Amino acid sequence: MPAFNRLFPLASLLLILWVGVCFPVCVEVPSETEAVQGNPMKLRCISCMKREEVEATTVVEWFYRPEGGKDFLIYEYRNGHQEVESPFQGRLQWNGSKDLQDVSITVLNVTLNDSGLYTCNVSREFEFEAHRPFVKTTRLIPLRVTEEAGEDFTSVVSEIMMYILLVFLTLWLLIEMIYCYRKVSKAEEAAQENASDYLAIPSENKENSAVPVEE
């Protein structure tokens, strides 16, 4: 049982990785909210669909609201990509997926004036035999653009924890391998000792031990 308890977390991790590879899974990951001036910035917008909702007509609208201003349309997907006339014209790039579950866009050459609130609206009309339901989802991305990249304390801590976990798993696997090797070696030594003891018995004793005594 202790060995099972030690192996169960690793088996669970391997099972999750196997499922993720064999069966694509949609995960609604939030977007980054900080960008550096002059670099590209991906505005992530993911709207997952259930398996039975594959057939759908999807319309995507991206809006931008500057600080103290109003929303205005900067990008639209309706039967194809369409970049509308705006201050972002020529700097927006479609970064979504073919199934339109990921409808992200990338802002090229980010400037300080690009700080503000970005809104991603995803409208879907599902095609069923009996009815055609309409669903709309909204994602808000408050973006802050800085002149230089600042050190993110959270990312540093996460990176340190990742390395610690990696070292721990490596040591754990090494200990398990040594334990299994010693266990197999002891089993082989015991088998060899039993075989040696059997060979050391005189042949007469072997015959007597093999033939039952009749009264």
Curated annotation (Swiss-Prot):
Job of this protein: Regulatory subunit of multiple voltage-gated sodium (Nav) channels directly mediating the depolarization of excitable membranes. Navs, also called VGSCs (voltage-gated sodium channels) or VDSCs (voltage-dependent sodium channels), operate by switching between closed and open conformations depending on the voltage difference across the membrane. In the open conformation they allow Na(+) ions to selectively pass through the pore, along their electrochemical gradient.
Glycosylated sites: 95, 109, 113, 121
Disulfide pattern: 26-48, 45-120
Pfam families linked: V-set (PF07686)
Signal peptide: 1-22
Residue span, Ig-like C2-type domain: 32-154
The protein's name: Sodium channel regulatory subunit beta-3
Modifications the protein undergoes after translation, according to the UniProt entry: Intramolecular disulfide bonds favor the voltage-gated sodium channel oligomeric complex assembly.
Compartment(s): Cell membrane
One MF annotation (Gene Ontology) recorded for this entry: sodium channel regulator activity
Residues passing through the membrane, by range: 157-178
Cytoplasmic side: 179-215
InterPro entries xrefs: Ig-like_dom (IPR007110), Ig-like_dom_sf (IPR036179), Ig-like_fold (IPR013783), Ig_sub (IPR003599), Ig_V-set (IPR013106), Na_channel_b1/b3 (IPR027098)
Membrane topology, record value: Single-pass type I membrane protein
GO cellular component, one term: cytosol
Principal place of residence: membrane
SMART domains on file: IG (SM00409)
UniProt family annotation: Belongs to the sodium channel auxiliary subunit SCN3B (TC 8.A.17) family.
Complexes and interactors: A voltage-gated sodium (Nav) channel consists of an ion-conducting pore-forming alpha subunit functional on its own that is regulated by one or more beta subunits. Forms homodimers and homotrimers. SCN3B is non-covalently associated with alpha subunits and induces the formation of alpha subunit oligomers, including trimers. Interacts with SCN5A/Nav1.5; regulatory subunit of SCN5A/Nav1.5. Interacts with SCN7A/Nav2.1; probable regulatory subunit of SCN7A/Nav2.1. Interacts with SCN10A; regulatory subunit of SCN10A/Nav1.8.
Membrane topology (Extracellular): 23-156
GO biological process, one term: atrial cardiac muscle cell action potential
Keyword set, alphabetical order: Cell membrane, Disulfide bond, Glycoprotein, Immunoglobulin domain, Ion channel, Ion transport, Membrane, Signal, Sodium, Sodium channel, Sodium transport, Transmembrane, Transmembrane helix, Transport, Voltage-gated channel
